[in-house]
């Protein structure tokens, strides 16, 4: 399996190469030359597998340059009890009225990002050790990616992490998870701005090929294909757990940067019988607007709202380019032209392709408000006893619009509610204690560097602290 760029300017590379590469040299994103296919008989044969062994089967289709027994060791190290609280790794719970909850928050940072990041922590160390080199991870987080990456990579050999976060725009629990880490290879940088500005700095630094090469910059954001591939596994798992034999399921996905639902798009393209991919946004509804109108119109920082589902306060979805690549017939020249239009005009129009969004690719979309979130959290708890976080509530609210008889609808859990205590208290009128082992998290000393949104200042910080 080789990988190319969505913009056509990268020679085919292996899985391990793109794992370390991050953004492609031409500014595009790595994508498989062709998607591997899984037939119905193979799918059925995977029903009895553990999550770790299912991950091996799926990831072996993408990471063809890693010997099979080595890869199996990596997936078993990543997906095991002790790292994850549930024996199933990803439990499925009933929510009633045709909905089920895919439990993706059983990992060490209580968020779905752990599902991919625990594998990345293993495979980064594996590849770097065998190549005898180092890597400096530079990423941006709106709340959950940062802590998941840092917990997966803390203390790992040959890796340093530089994680940018928007100052004052994450929950207290999210900040404490990241900033309380004291490991010497973890560096937190809070920038005075919004997530999109932090992400722009990361892309700017990654786009400087001389700097990227000298300091061996890598990525753990979902621009890294390994993140997307690892997330594909839980769509297979969800189908195997919820679908009647040979039947279809739908997935509802709270969406900000388009990485999570993109993995569903990939799983569907590989052969998982997915009826619909239901995209749910909050008030920052750039993606919902695209699937409703066909026009992609990102907003500036001044029009990116601070909401009660803060991890989705994103107005430029970096992973969207991979879907557009498929939408325009895998034409890299067309993708490069569209992103040039975006840079020049601030938008592009694919409304002529709008009929394909659902009929060919299964995408539908909806948005949720603060009032919707509070009501959904309260009603879900009252009706089922299941407490969900505000992002998952966005998913449930939108999912209800698209439930079909006989087609299970799995809502992807985003995080545990303890990470968003203020919103849960507003919804239920009472506080939700964090897990016992994290009760003192917010009182721990915190280590973070505060900066303006200045790529040169971030560059200087990396130069001073990088592993070289």
Predicted region positions:
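PLP-dependent amino-acid enzyme catalytic core
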Residues: 1-468
